[in-house]
Amino acid sequence: MTFMTRLFCAGGALLSLTALATIAQADGRDWNDGPVVNVASIRTVDGHFDEYMHWLATTYRKQQEAAKTAGLITSYRVMVVEARTPQDPDIYLVTEYKNWAALDRLGGKFDQVSAQVEGSVEKAAQSEADRAKIRTVLGSRTQQEALLK
């Protein structure tokens, strides 16, 4: 190889690497969009914690596993926390979705999962009404993880 050929090859490689680095930083952000996470805050009625945990370990788990199999969610967790006041949650239900688009038309898709697990949408609705006697949903929040580069 001649000196000029080597020089052109080295220059071309350097130019290619510079272009790749520029493309990688083109959006100017120091993070990428991560999964979307919903956290529901639950407060169990005094004396009914074990009953609610039993429901979570049985029916809820079946629903969430069916939702994972259907590709509706990527993961779920049940977090037991120490409530600081009587108005604080004692359980967080954490559900992870691939992205914001995964939430589009999610209600109808989850109705199908509920019907599959509990027999019908009506039975699932009655089951939810019955759970109101042993727990209160204090609210929920949905957020997106920022994956730092």
Predicted regions: what is each one?
Residues A26-E51:
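Immediate post-signal-peptide N-terminus of mature secreted/exported proteins
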Residues M1-A13:
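Bacterial N-terminal signal peptides that target proteins for export
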